[in-house]
UniProtKB/Swiss-Prot annotation:
GO terms for cellular component: cytoplasm; nuclear body. Residues 219-228, 391-401, 427-444, 520-590, 609-621, 632-696 have a biased composition (Basic and acidic residues). There is a cross-link at residues 225, 310 (Glycyl lysine isopeptide (Lys-Gly) (interchain with G-Cter in SUMO)). Residues 262-281 have a biased composition (Acidic residues). It holds the Pfam family RRM_1. This is Scaffold attachment factor B2. InterPro entries: Nucleotide-bd_a/b_plait_sf, RBD_domain_sf, RRM_dom, SAF_Modulators, SAFB1_2_RBD, SAP_dom, SAP_dom_sf. The modification Omega-N-methylarginine is found at residue 939. It comes from Mus musculus (Mouse). GO terms for molecular function: DNA binding; identical protein binding; RNA binding.
């Protein structure tokens, strides 16, 4: 490769510049820009403008003018240019969209192309980039200028190409067919892949495990030789112009599809179909090695069944990723165009492929079986796609493709002499290796029967790398993966480890069973479902079937019988039912082609391989070891159709009667189940109804009790209020009673006091009978006299005869009796005085002398008003009767019959204040004047009981009380007295 910055190394200044031509920087495509940047060890990522700017800077650093530098570009054939121009737009677009093809470009050898594909494989499958140096340990082939010279001299004619290939450098021819170096490289690549596989993420581990299984078993297989058949020749003629670099690109695509089968199978199929259409126009002859023409033939044949199966899988829901597919298809077309342009790399490019190649002497393989397998798989492809475990069909197809890739077939008879010689050698070698291959397959199948280990009880955080590192302590680990139950993710984790030998597997069980990993106790045991054993039996059946079509093979009957036995064993494993219409369809499909055994092989191996899908096998009651390679939607869509394919495989077991009987039993069980379910539902509804009724009754009873409780509470409150009211009334009554008793007691005390005062008063009156002087000025203070009193005429009382017999019979001994009689009489007449004065006392205490107690005789104040003028003015009672009243006592008893009822009203003066003042004035008048002889001399007054009225004049006339207005005292000789027709106005009572 040219050194950057050197003029001699630059293609623009090399010796072939004139032949190849140059282009300016602005005319370069993205891939050319990246090639120039790669030469200078610069970054090749980014779009076209970024790449162009980066290259300009590189030219400026080299001291060149970017716009004036002419960049050489290899002269490819017209047809190749036509094809590249046809896809140039898609190439540039893919280059801008995806930076993964940064190492692939024109003008470089096949090693770089292989590195590009290997890098893409590394990125797609999750293998670390550190693998690249180990995997690509094949020496670099040739210099860039040598390759450019060969490309410049390339011509359309096969002879010219053969002549040019004869002139290849020794370095290219040295590595073209180096058997030992290639085998060592292949072993190193396989071991590196195995070691690095455990570091992948969990979703990528199943696919990589497939790759390891394929590499570990296929690369060591020795495929038998197969003579070129009539079916091979047309394909070989149509594709003989394809170089080995095209094969490298296709093998690279196959390697990618192994890494991501669910995403890239469809795009690979479409790419191969497009390539087959375009290969008719590509007449590039490359016959450096015998593998080149037959490789294209084999791929043309092998892609057809892949196309059918992958299209079926891609049509399933969830098999999308169309944008990614388109980008990868663009990238693949570009690499294939580069491989065609660099076809002179020949065997060198083939040797640079680390995997998928076999010993050159043994590379005449089974291309003749491929057309037959194609026809069989075209018929069987829908069944394979709809099998109960659809991912296994893809796995088997990938194995088939790898077999076809590794076992490079012999060229057609039109090839050169060297090709014919190689064909003969491979034929002889193949015949010698038939029996060793069969024995090797059987030995490997028996050897691998016990090397699969099932690890249970793993922690959810356990990864495949942990299992790989743990089990590698006790032997060589072929593959390790962690599987889970897809129907309940995260529930439990299991591990599936494949050891290199069964002895190592047994050793791992003895050392690792019931040990701790990540805090969980793990159990290691032999896998019950042996996918590797079934795969080996499938592969053995495949190899034996490939021997059948040769006309000189003595084994077809034996192999077919063996395959029939395998088929029946697989059918017996299925427990599902199959309808009669499925059987008819299968019979029709079986009649379409005589090679039904071949396509049934694909289907059965596919259905077996799907045991590695992450599911739980309900019929077996254990986890089924599987690989989750597609989305769940695709799994569901495939599982929804698996009963058809399973039914087709059981056409030799169940008859119509058995099917009907089985379906009838199933329907009967279904009916019984429905009846039981209905009965249970009815009982449940009845219980629920009863519970609802009970709840309703309970609620109603509770409401009734609540209402009654409220009523009782209201009654209790009402009774409490009534009780409180009664208590209040009782307390009020008792209070009134206490007050009444107190009042009665007070009244009794007052009566006693009054009686005592009366007794004291009588005793005092008896003790002293004082004559009080006439107080003239006291009359002025009387407020009851509104005007001055007129002087009475002296002849006022002249006409009143004065009875002389009133005091004749007075007896002093009756004075006490007279006093008591006067008091009783005054008490009896008090009611009339009160009625006359307008004073009404409803209480009975005022009707029996109580007026006297309150007014006249209260507290002894009634009779001491005479003592002074002040007391007279205050009006605190009547003055006591004069001592002369004793003289009236005896005479009063004689006058009692002669008194009229008006006397009491006229004389009763103990309640009004002006009455006793008048009587007092009368006393003064009576006492002051000279009275007649019958009045006691010196006593000066009248009786306190008011027997005589006040005269009102100073002459001292004694006016008898009977002559007063309003009634008075009538004498015993009434008829002899004449009343005064003109009474004195002072004696007229004013009420």
């Amino acid at each position: 490769m040219a050194e950057p910055g050197t003029g001699s190394g630059d293609p623009a200044f090399g010796p072939g510049a004139s032949e190849s031509g140059t282009r300016r920087l602005s005319d370069l495509r993205v891939i050319d820009l990246r090639a120039e940047l790669k030469k200078r060890n610069l970054d090749t990522g980014g779009n076209k403008s970024v790449l162009m700017e980066r290259l300009r800077k590189a030219f400026k650093e080299e001291g060149q003018e970017p716009e004036e530098v002419g960049i050489s570009w290899g002269a490819v054939s017209k047809r190749a240019v036509k094809r590249n121009t046809k896809g140039s737009k898609m190439e540039e677009e893919g280059s801008e969209d995806n930076g993964l093809e940064e190492d692939s470009r024109y003008g470089q050898d096949g090693v770089v192309i292989l590195q590009s594909s290997q890098d893409r494989d590394t990125m797609d499958t999750g293998v670390p980039d550190g693998m690249e140096a180990e995997d690509l340990s094949v020496p670099c082939l040739g210099k860039a200028d040598t390759v450019n010279q060969i490309l410049h001299a390339f011509d359309d004619s096969k002879e010219y190409v053969a002549a040019q290939l004869g002139q290849l450098p020794a370095q290219l021819l040295k590595h073209a067919v180096d058997e030992e170096v290639f085998k060592n490289t292949l072993e190193a690549s396989v071991s590196d892949l195995k070691v690095t596989l455990a570091d992948e993420e969990a979703p990528m581990e199943p696919e990589n495990e497939k790759i390891l299984d394929i590499l570990g078993e296929t690369c060591k297989s020795e495929p038998v030789k197969e003579e070129g058949s009539e079916l091979e020749q047309p394909f070989a003629q149509a594709t003989s112009s394809v170089g080995p670099d095209r094969k490298l690109a296709e093998e690279e695509d196959l390697f990618e599809s192994c890494g991501h089968p669910e995403e890239e199978e469809e795009e690979e199929e479409e790419d191969q179909e497009e390539e087959q259409e375009e290969e008719g126009d590509l007449a590039l002859a490359s016959s450096s090695k015998s593998e080149s023409p037959s490789t294209r033939c084999q791929w043309s044949e092998a892609d057809a069944p892949l196309a059918v199966v992958k299209r079926e899988l891609a049509d399933a829901p969830g098999g999308g990723g169309g944008t990614r597919h388109r980008r990868k298809r663009k990238r693949r077309r570009k690499h294939q165009a580069q491989a065609e342009a660099l076809g002179t790399g020949g065997g060198a490019g083939m040797n640079c492929e680390p995997v998928g190649l076999e010993e050159p002497v043994e590379q005449s393989s089974t291309a003749a079986q491929l057309p037959e397998a194609t026809s069989q798989e075209l018929v069987r492809a829908p069944t394979a796609a709809l099998s109960p475990e659809p991912q296994d069909s893809k796995e088997d197809v990938k194995k088939f493709a790898f077999d076809a890739c590794n076992d490079v077939p012999a060229p057609p008879k039109e090839s050169s002499a060297s090709e014919g010689a190689d064909q003969k050698m491979s034929s002889v070698k193949e015949e010698q290796d038939i029996k060793p291959v069969i024995k090797d397959e059987k030995g490997r199948a028996s050897c691998s029967s016990g090397r699969n280990l099932w690890v249970s009880g793993l922690s959810s955080s356990t990864r495949a790398a942990d299992l790989k590192s743990l089990f590698s302590k006790h032997g060589k680990v072929i593959g390790a993966k962690v599987v889970t139950n897809a129907r309940s993710p995260g529930a439990r984790c299991y591990g599936f480890v494949t050891m290199s030998t069964s002895d190592e597997a047994t050793k791992c069980i003895s050392h690792l069973h019931r040990t701790e990993l990540h805090g969980r106790m793990i159990s290691v045991e032999k896998a019950k479902n042996e996918p590797s054993e079934k795969k080996s039996s499938d592969r053995r059946a495949c190899d034996q079937k490939e021997k059948v079509p040769g006309p000189d093979r003595p084994h077809p009957v034996k192999i077919k019988t063996e395959k029939t036995v395998i088929k029946k064993e697989e059918k017996l494993e299925r427990k599902e039912e199959k309808g009669p219409e499925d059987i008819k369809k299968e019979k029709d499909q079986d009649e379409l082609t005589p090679g039904a055994a071949g396509h049934s092989r694909v289907t059965k191996s596919g259905s077996r391989g799907m045991e590695r899908t992450v599911v739980m096998d309900k019929s077996k009651g254990e986890p089924v070891i599987s690989v989750k390679a597609t989305s769940r939607s695709k799994d569901r869509s495939s599982k929804s159709q698996d009963r058809k394919s399973e039914g087709r495989e059981k056409r030799d077991i169940l008859s119509f009667d058995k099917i009907k009987e089985q379906r009838e039993r199933e329907r009967q069980r279904q009916r019984e189940r429905e009846i039981r379910e209905t009965e249970r539902r009815r009982e449940r509804e009845q219980r629920e109804r009863e519970q609802r009724l009970d709840a309703f009754q309970e609620r109603r009873e509770k409401a009734r009790l609540q209402r009654e409780r409220m009523q009782l509470q209201c009654q209790r409150q009402r009774l409490e209020r009534e009780r409180l009211e009664r208590e209040r009334l009782e307390r009020e009554r008792m209070r009134v009673e206490r007050e009444r008793r107190k009042e009665q007691q007070r009244i009794m005390r007052e009566r006693e006091e009054l009686r005592r005062q009366q007794e004291q008063l009588r005793a005092e009156q008896e003790r002293r009978a004082l004559r009080r002087p006439y107080d003239l000025d006291a009359r002025r203070d009387d407020g009851y006299w509104p005007e001055g009193k007129r002087a009475a005429l002296e002849d006022r009382y002249r006409d009143f005869p004065r009875p002389d017999h009133r005091f004749h019979d007075f007896d002093h001994r009756d004075r006490g009796h007279y006093q008591e009689h006067v008091i009783d009489r005054r008490d009896g007449s008090r009611t009339r005085v009160e009625e006359r004065d307008g004073q009404y006392y409803p209480d009975d205490q005022h009707s029996h002398g109580r007026l006297l107690e309150h007014h006249a005789w209260d507290s002894g104040d009634g009779w001491h008003g005479y003592s002074s003028d002040k007391k007279l003015n205050e009006g605190q009672g009547l003055p006591p009767p004069p001592r002369v009243s004793r003289e009236w006592a005896e005479h009063s008893s004689q006058l009692e019959e002669q008194q009229v009822p008006v006397w009491h009203s006229a004389v009763d003066t103990n309640m009004t204040g002006h009455e006793h003042i008048r009587w007092r004035g009368a006393e003064r008048g009576l006492a002051g004047g000279p009275g007649h002889g019958h009045v006691a001399a010196g006593r000066g007054g009248m009786a306190g009981q008011g027997s005589f009225a006040h005269g009102g004049h100073s002459q001292g006339y004694i006016v008898p009380s009977g002559r007063l207005e309003g009634g008075g005292m009538a004498s015993q000789d009434q008829g002899g007295r004449v009343p005064n027709p003109h009474p004195h106005p002072h004696f007229t009572r004013r009420y």
